[in-house]
Amino acid sequence: MAFPVISTYRVQMRGRSNGFGFTFADAENLLDYLDDLGVSHLYLSPILTAVGGSTHGYDVTDPTTVSPELGGSDGLARLSAAARSRGMGLIVDIVPSHVGVGKPEQNAWWWDVLKFGRSSAYAEFFDIDWELGDGRIILPLLGSDSDVANLRVDGDLLRLGDLALPVAPGSGDGTGPAVHDRQHYRLVGWRHGLCGYRRFFSITSLAGLRQEDRAVFDASHAEVARWFTEGLVDGVRVDHLDGLSDPSGYLAQLRELLGPNAWIVVEKILAVDEALEPTLPVDGSTGYDVLREIGGVLVDPQGESPLTALVESAGVDYQEMPAMLADLKVHAAVHTLASELRRLRRCIAAAAGADHPLLPAAVAALLRHIGRYRCDYPGQAAVLPCALAETHSTTPQLAPGLQLIAAAVARGGEPAVRLQQLCGAVSAKAVEDCMFYRDARLVSLNEVGGEPRRFGVGAAEFHHRAATRARLWPRSMTTLSTHDTKRGEDVRARIGVLSQVPWLWAKFIGHAQAIAPAPDAVTGQFLWQNVFGVWPVSGEVSAALRGRLHTYAEKAIREAAWHTSWHNPNRAFEDDVHGWLDLVLDGPLASELTGLVAHLNSHAESDALAAKLLALTVPGVPDVYQGSELWDDSLVDPDNRRPVDYGTRRVALKALQHPKIRVLAAALRLRRTHPESFLGGAYHPVFAAGPAADHVVAFRRGDDILVAVTRWTVRLQQTGWDHTVLPLPDGSWTDALTGFTASGHTPAVELFADLPVVLLVRDNA
């Protein structure tokens, strides 16, 4: 029997073969705590067999089996039964777009293709570019082409260091290089930009699957189907939907396979002006859009101008950021994804019946003008024609190439599909993996699904989007933190407070730059905000935090790719940044930063509580990311996959003194007792009245729940509530957080006397 999905709690599964772990048995031991917290469903990261020692599970090597490292099928069955006995259920993250091939010997399908080539039973499972290598699969696994000379034959294997590859039957005689020349694959240096198969973005160790082939879908989803047939699982999250050839077709097959009652949400990164395609047979998205709205409504718009001036003082013309992003898209297409661009060119030329030297440049230029991950959903039909027209208007010299693109795409088929897949990959590499590490104005806005150039979200827009979601997607996921977010929810909340005190932050940055100038001013401003976001209130920087900050700084500057990068590390610049960071952590600025954090921490906690209560009560199904019941200082992965101290959280849940777990437990428990108010209930804004009315965001869910949170508390601290009231609907209302009772026009000063948020329940409801 499936249970209605009212809320979820995400855990990161991990085998114990690589340090700490979190298996099905560990999850089973957590169920009593989650049940007490009020969670309806435990939400598992990918659980199919992945590369040995995988720390995340997105590198699945065998889609037909549950990971033995996690406890196998028996462990999953025990976990499901234990959850069912408590009236709870399971949600599982699935990865249809790709599989892990970084260790070829662990992926039987990939191994078979490498061994038998086009005659393999699995040759059509992968999106292989057979033309690129004259019938051989190009594998960019070498440091340089000359490494082929070091290949050695070991029985029916070719070896190079830790790399092992199969030898085709009857081709194993001779030296390593000679045997290599007779294989169905060809090893090349990775710097050539050649790859013989579609990848997950530019990650060579993740090979794309052809889910559009029904045989591939059936083979890769048989195990997932079993979970639903046997009643083990109630829903799935679909990873990287836009990487598929036909997302809509895939979801239609998935819905048919899993049944009408399965809860299906999709990882779909939506542009600010983009709606989730209404024809998709799903319950909604994974909530990046809601994350942007919640974070944005708490940002103080008065901070935009001074924070813009501050980042421009470092030599950045903020008005040029859109042009920079456009250039990054071109770079991603032409360089990072060069192999995919070459393949698309051949497809377009074949479909159009002609080629042109300007075709690659035309594709890259076109992608500059497509402001979303892909635009072939029915509701986005106008995007590509408009982008073609805009590209022609700005770069008329590319007309010959644009004409070929238009002609080929109009016919549909492979060129149209590959253009869309390249568009998504280009967007990810340019925006999330680079631009979000360059924009230093207010880095809490640099989030998956976010738009940093839009400084916050107005209350009217917030209410409009929430009401629309209540009507169209009432069971969509809402979230504040995921394994993909650039920083944890509480880190974002603290950084967001800088929008309220831009003058104070500018003063600190000016002093910091004078005492400890960063190797690069913009890099310094970017890193300073992140350091501020995780800085302990006590000012005591542990060895663990020091290491985490150094790891983060190195990742950030390589992703930004201004002075160093993953492909071409600039060790001198990186050493300078590490030295500067040590000076920050150990020098005189540390005490000054501690004072600033202490001064603003109450405001940061207020925003964090407001964001959490909003996420738990706006239309949708809220997800709680592991460990975020208490203040969480996580940064980007792998930092956000650290082990969680559940002993401390169990104690906190019993005491309910910590404000965050208090808010969380009250809201989750209320959702469980009043599901009709949250899953089916309407959304109605409630407006405060008085001089400080703008400091309140409030709404009703159904007839018996009213939520109100405060914002912009720095200004509020200066002005006070000054007779501001919140008009409550008829009846008596009790705050589930404090027990405070109210009715009628209630003074805000009384309503928010104990906490900056209230969760009101109509008495006798």
UniProtKB/Swiss-Prot annotation:
Family, similarity comment: Belongs to the glycosyl hydrolase 13 family.
Cellular component, GO annotation: cytosol
Known catalytic reactions: 4-[(1->4)-alpha-D-glucosyl](n-1)-D-glucose = 1-[(1->4)-alpha-D-glucosyl](n-1)-alpha-D-glucose
Subunit structure: Monomer.
UniProt cross-references to InterPro entries, sorted A to Z: Glyco_hydro_13_cat_dom (IPR006047), Glycoside_hydrolase_SF (IPR017853), Maltooligo_trehalose_synth_4 (IPR013797), Trehalose_TreY (IPR012767)
Record key words, sorted: Isomerase
GO biological process: one example: trehalose biosynthetic process
Source domain of life: Bacteria
PANTHER family: ALPHA-AMYLASE FAMILY MEMBER (PTHR10357), MALTOOLIGOSYL TREHALOSE SYNTHASE-RELATED (PTHR10357:SF216)
Keyword flag Isomerase: yes
GO-annotated molecular function: (1,4)-alpha-D-glucan 1-alpha-D-glucosylmutase activity
Highest classification ranks of the organism: Bacteria, Bacillati, Actinomycetota, Actinomycetes, Mycobacteriales
Covalent S-S links between cysteines: none
Gene expressing this chain: treY
Role: Catalyzes the conversion of maltooligosaccharide into the non-reducing saccharide, maltooligosyl trehalose (alpha-maltooligosyl alpha-D-glucoside) by intramolecular transglycosylation.
This enzyme's EC code(s): 5.4.99.15
Protein name: Putative maltooligosyl trehalose synthase
